[in-house]
Regions:
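Extended substrate/RNA-proximal surfaces in nucleic-acid metabolism proteins
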Residues: 1-102
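Charged catalytic cores and adjacent phosphate/nucleic-acid-binding surfaces used
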Residues: 21, 80-182
Length: 182
């Protein structure tokens, strides 16, 4: 056997190997805030850099088929600690996108934050999807479903993909295939 494909993503961030962990996911913004304070002494830039460093290490060492929600660190931020349009943040995003392309990974476009009401955009965010398109990074659409009722939550994603210029997506059906954005 073996796996058909692997999705790689980071949910827990540490400051030092073996150290305390910052949980960036989950339903509670309070956990994000408390972890930021406890693990990184409230230094959001250091924390976000650690998130992207770990994401890049995962991509380079594991070479997953799909990189999942690599801007998830912004979910509970809600533009409170940093702006996702700030240059230092976008530089980290671009570095990760370059690595995704170099390693031949597919980038997931994930709708979960929207349909769960936890985020105001897709993962990655629209501005990042635009960059992905210009870099010609292959993309797959996912709901990141945790239960059957979440399987068809694709509202708005195909319209956005057409608007930003994506022409083709990839999907797995025993082998990797391409499809036109409809």
């Amino acid at each position: 056997g073996g796996l058909d494909y692997c999705i790689g993503s980071v949910h827990l961030v540490n400051k030092t190997r073996g150290g305390d962990l910052w949980f960036i996911d989950g339903s509670k913004q309070q956990s994000y805030d408390e972890g930021l304070s406890r693990v990184f002494d409230g230094n959001i830039k250091e924390a976000v850099r650690a998130f992207f460093r770990q994401t890049n290490e995962m991509i380079a060492s594991q070479r997953p088929s799909i990189v999942g929600h690599f801007d998830k660190v912004a979910m509970h931020n809600k533009e409170r600690y940093f702006g996702t349009d700030e240059e230092w943040y976008l530089a980290l995003v671009r570095e990760t996108l370059e690595l995704i392309k170099e390693c031949g990974c597919v980038c997931e476009i994930n709708t979960r934050g929207l349909y769960k009401g936890r985020y105001s955009d897709f993962y990655p965010a629209t501005r990042i999807i635009r960059i992905m398109n210009t870099m010609e990074i292959p993309a797959v659409v996912s709901t990141d479903a945790h239960q059957p009722d979440d399987l068809d939550k694709f509202e708005g994603v195909y319209t956005l993909l057409r608007e930003v210029g994506y022409k083709r997506l990839v999907y797995f059906d025993g082998t990797w295939n391409e499809m036109k954005v409809f």
